Amino acid sequence: MSSRLPALPLSRRQALLGGAGSAAALLLPGGAQAQTRLQITEGNVAPMPIAIPNFVAGTPADNEVGLGVAQVITNNLKRSGLFAPIDQAAFIERISNIDTPPQFQSWKTINAQALVTGRMTKQGDGRLKAEFRLWDVAAGQQLTGQQYFTSPEYWRRIAHIISDQIYERLTGEKGYFDSRVVFIDETGSKERRVKRLALMDQDGANVRYLTRGADLVLTPRFSPSTQEITYMEFGQGDPRVYLFNIETGQREIVGNFPGMSFSPRFSPDGQRVIMSLQQGGNSNLFVMDLRSKSTTRLTDTPAIDTSPSYAPDGSKICFESDRGGKPQIYVMPAGGGGAQRISFGEGSYSTPVWSPRGDYIAFTKQGGGQFSIGIMKPDGSGERLLTSGYHNEGPTFAPNGRVLMFFRDPGGNGGPSLFTVDISGRNEQKVPTPGFASDPAWSPLLS
């Protein structure tokens, strides 16, 4: 295990937090026995009241980072829609020592069901030590606890990792906070719009620009390792698909095909890129092996086949095709052949993407003058629209498959913004970005 978090961008899932005992459990005697858990369904869920005091400062110099970590955790859990952080002004007990049990009655009085306590301490070697404990207030018992070591500049990532620990322990599902989003940053007027490839934390922090905006870029997608991004760029001549290495900043073209290449996406094992290639007036799906550079044709129709997305186990592909007259969603084996249409509602369907859990396919649906974001099961059943408006497009799943991010363009002289919504259709939230933003793609978990 690494001795510290790597420099930004964090792209290696195995490069976690450093030092001996970097993820050691912190359990007081009798801990981890309580059973508090939020029951998640696809209907309405009453958010769990949770108290998150500022993390205790190991030294006076650690006070600011202790406040910051608590605030990031609070914002993460609140934005999920599953938790209701209690205003700190209501707190009765002041946490000064996380090594002793809290006064549970004080937290029961303000109706907290769960309590998070923590401490941030700068070590003699310059590293930052982060500790936290999660408590079941009703049972008066500790649920879990961990400690981590890292460089001080990575305190926000510590907060995201702790948020994931809390989310998983209280919901039974994996979290999604220690992840990133690649998107298209847009600036300037609509007539002279500049589009740059950009990277940020899932909450909008730590924005980093990967391209300068000299050429138009679209549809970025993460590799499973999060080390690379594939995207389409309009440079000199036809649009091409590229690979961009986040760690080195190097890029390379994916194949040198005649005509346009677009809508790229990695296979689940990261060894192949599937894309659409234009030949004549048609566009068909091809897959390229990144090691051998060999290319295999997957579809061969007088139509436009595009926007492919693999099932998480790599066995199937969903894609968009107008072979039936207007854009619809089809599913076929990953090796090609036997495509089956799964969308049959009114309107047209585009930009399908498979959930990391394999249970849903998200899509953009156009009809009745609106663009909607929806989900359906892989066999086409259970279609449900989550949000509608003038122009909603480009859904991407969070690593746990629970939340979708998409972009919305209100029209007029403005520009697009990023939003998230739960797969139940609840809890729509705007994602902060420096300017206009479109084409989001969520990374897998970084840890």
UniProtKB/Swiss-Prot annotation:
Assigned GO CC terms: periplasmic space
Keywords: Cell cycle, Cell division, Periplasm, Signal
Residues covered by region (Disordered): 426-447
Disulfide-bonded cysteines: none
Keyword Cell division: yes
PROSITE patterns: TAT (PS51318)
Gene3D superfamilies to which the protein is assigned, alphabetical: TolB, C-terminal domain, TolB, N-terminal domain
Signal sequence interval, chain numbering: 1-34
Location in the cell: Periplasm
One annotated GO biological process: cell division
Main location class: periplasm
Function: Part of the Tol-Pal system, which plays a role in outer membrane invagination during cell division and is important for maintaining outer membrane integrity.
PANTHER family recorded: PROTEIN TOLB (PTHR36842:SF1), PROTEIN TOLB HOMOLOG (PTHR36842)
Family the UniProt entry places it in: Belongs to the TolB family.
Subunit comment: The Tol-Pal system is composed of five core proteins: the inner membrane proteins TolA, TolQ and TolR, the periplasmic protein TolB and the outer membrane protein Pal. They form a network linking the inner and outer membranes and the peptidoglycan layer.
Protein name: Tol-Pal system protein TolB
Biological source species: Rhodopseudomonas palustris (strain BisB18)
Gene: tolB
